[in-house]
């Protein structure tokens, strides 16, 4: 359980809606492409309505202030998808260490579990502790050029190491690191300008209305639970 999971949830009933098609998406969707159990392609690109409204403003502002577009990497995840991706990440980490294990024995390797949980929320079916993406309030975003091509940010989305920390390059003074840090700063500044909160371990992960957002903004409760 994360520290922000202590925040109570009072879901305000905001609807889960499709993200407008004029925003840029990563295609093909990375998890759907891996076989994650989405109901169908229409259920992939969705968020809570207020989150979508804020995201549109972010994209418009970003375009007006820079040469970049916002590129949406991932959005709402049904719990089944969160479970699929969490298990996959755990088993891949086991393979790297030449450990042959079934997911049912996950607690036998607490160090691997701890590493995975730093980047992937546990797929809890307890409504008090929903994974951020399963609330419809969290999304993963990158910068792209005007043609939708990914801009280098210093690590890949979902890369499970220290380079994914939002501030990893802040004190590294080579030319590439300075560029990557400035791009991460730009993304964070614009997302937070429109009310989003950034995940402490992931430069790409932002949310509005979930428990992480409530914790970072010192709110009494979260606005969104599992949906």
Residue ranges and their predicted role:
Residues 206:
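Conserved metal-phosphate-binding beta-hairpin within the catalytic cores
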Residues 1-75, 79-200, 213-227:
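Extracytoplasmic cell-surface/polysaccharide-interacting catalytic and binding patches
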């Amino acid at each position: 359980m994360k520290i922000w999971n202590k925040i109570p949830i009072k879901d305000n009933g905001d609807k889960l809606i499709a993200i407008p098609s004029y925003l840029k998406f990563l295609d093909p969707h990375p998890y759907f492409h891996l076989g994650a159990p989405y109901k169908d392609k229409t259920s992939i690109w969705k968020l809570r309505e207020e989150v979508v409204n804020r995201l549109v403003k972010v994209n418009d502002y970003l375009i007006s202030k820079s040469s970049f577009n916002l590129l949406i990497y991932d959005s709402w995840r049904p719990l089944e998808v969160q479970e699929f991706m969490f298990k996959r990440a755990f088993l891949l980490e086991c393979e790297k260490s030449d450990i042959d294990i079934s997911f049912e024995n996950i607690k036998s390797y607490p160090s691997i579990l701890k590493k995975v949980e730093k980047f992937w929320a546990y797929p809890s079916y307890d409504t008090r502790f929903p994974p951020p993406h399963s609330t419809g309030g969290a999304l993963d975003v990158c910068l792209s050029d005007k043609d939708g091509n990914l801009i280098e940010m210093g690590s890949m989305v979902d890369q499970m190491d220290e380079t994914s920390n939002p501030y990893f390059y802040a004190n590294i003074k080579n030319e590439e690191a300075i560029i990557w840090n400035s791009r991460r700063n730009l993304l964070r500044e614009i997302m937070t300008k429109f009310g989003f909160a950034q995940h402490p371990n992931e430069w790409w992960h932002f949310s509005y209305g979930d428990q992480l957002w409530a914790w970072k903004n010192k709110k009494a409760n979260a606005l969104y639970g599992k949906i």
